[in-house]
Regions:
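N-terminal Rossmann-like FAD-binding beta1-loop-alpha1 element of flavoenzymes
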Residues: 4-33
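Flexible, glycine-rich phosphate/dinucleotide-binding loops
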Residues: 17, 40, 52, 115, ...
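Short, glycine/charged-enriched secondary-structure capping and boundary segments
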Residues: 24, 46-49, 121-123
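A structural signal for short, well-ordered beta-strand segments and their strand-loop junctions
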Residues: 32-35, 106-108
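Glycine-rich active-site loop/strand segments that organize a redox cofactor
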Residues: 38-91
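Feature captures the FAD/FMN-dependent oxidoreductase FAD-binding
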Residues: 75-133
């Protein structure tokens, strides 16, 4: 049986949005990652602050593997090193967003106005047996 996987829309290209898109794409899901500004803009706003946890706790094994597959010479931070928010963005989040798994599905400078579910033409067409999302 070859069922088509549902398309996943992720709102926000911050750390969680990028990692979520990465895992979904790795599993074969079609993904669109929307960001109203720049990648990890909120982290960049407090980029001067040192993170409370080391890099190893702020990255995933899939993220590290994706970066190494993309560029074997990419210098990853020491897993025990603590960095500023800005360093986290420039050394991990931006390169990850530029990787083959994310780059094609990322849409920056796009503000999401509304979301919904397929098959709902109007409020009266809601089938109570269907899950809401």
């Amino acid at each position: 049986m070859n069922e088509e996987l549902p398309k996943i829309a992720i709102i926000g290209a911050g750390p969680m949005g990028i990692e979520t898109a990465l895992y979904a794409r790795f599993l074969g899901y079609p993904v669109v990652l929307f960001e109203k500004g720049e990648i990890a803009a909120h982290v960049q706003a407090w980029g001067h602050v040192q993170l409370f946890t080391p890099f190893g706790m702020n990255s995933s094994s899939l993220g590290i593997s994706a970066l190494q597959a993309q560029d074997p010479n990419h210098a990853l931070p020491d897993p025990n090193a603590q960095h500023s928010g800005r360093d986290w963005v420039t050394k991990y989040l931006e390169p990850l967003a530029s990787s083959d798994l994310i780059r094609g599905c990322l849409r920056t400078h796009v503000q999401v106005q509304a979301i919904g579910k397929d098959r709902f033409a109007s409020p009266t067409s809601i089938d109570a047996s269907m899950p809401p999302f």
